[in-house]
């Protein structure tokens, strides 16, 4: 039997930002028994001894007091290091470009946090993500948030039926300007707080400086595929496929882009032109596949896919290789498909699941220098 809202405990992850603040407010207004939890995933004391997590937690405390809900802080630093940060370093070490947000959602926010919330008697967890959950045809479906510009299903692509059955996304039907307005009307302390961007554990720090604390940089040669040396790179891990900034190649003509990496010889391949054919792939092998539905997939099916966040939907054919691997055939060649990033599958507004980009091909030829 379904519980009434006041009998339903919802434990919401609160970051100290406006989105999770309004999500908590909405749940409270809807009559749920709401508890706010601040997750401390990273020791982020900066060089001045200021811990931004402390500032964020103070914002959570203020908002929870304004709304009238209890709050706690939970430390997931060890789990985050083991499951997210170690993966992040391993991928960069392998010359790939990882997506820690996908792993954080899978392992921390909807696993470690979910388990903690259930121990607190939660019926559901909630977050400030822009996504929707619907129960249709006997199973849970994850749908894009109505705000196209903010939809975050790309980062949630690994969530399972079990996780979705315990999840609420209060912001899924709203657009960002509405959320800012609600926060303002309610007088929430975070109403005017700037949105956080970038990788959470790097924050405002310089990416190169941060990464070099954990992985020794190995400078090497920057050259074209035909062998023309164009300069030196600071370390392959600092560059991603399709990158333009930071190459330092002067001269006239079209701008230069990173088009590939040779890990064995520590070479960064570069070439000119945004639409350079070296940047385009039409076939992808992806691994670590996760489907939202438990129903068996057809061996081959058509859908759309995003190969990076906020990319337009691309028409593709997905072929199931095995339970962990798919082959993706693109209707049109796609620019800068990057090993290590997530590819996420959609049927209209429904997010079907996702995988990690492993190998990229063009016209049947493997792009060995990608990755």
Curated annotation (Swiss-Prot):
This is tRNA-specific 2-thiouridylase MnmA. The keyword Nucleus does not apply. It comes from Bacillus thuringiensis (strain Al Hakam). GO terms for molecular function: ATP binding; tRNA binding; tRNA-uridine 2-sulfurtransferase activity. CDD domains: MnmA_TRMU-like. Residues 150-152, 308-309 are annotated as: Interaction with tRNA. Catalyzes the 2-thiolation of uridine at the wobble position (U34) of tRNA, leading to the formation of s(2)U34. HAMAP family: tRNA_thiouridyl_MnmA. SUPFAM superfamilies: Adenine nucleotide alpha hydrolases-like. Disulfide bonds join 104-200. PANTHER family: MITOCHONDRIAL TRNA-SPECIFIC 2-THIOURIDYLASE 1 (PTHR11933:SF5), TRNA 5-METHYLAMINOMETHYL-2-THIOURIDYLATE -METHYLTRANSFERASE (PTHR11933). Keywords: ATP-binding, Cytoplasm, Disulfide bond, Nucleotide-binding, RNA-binding, Transferase, tRNA processing, tRNA-binding.
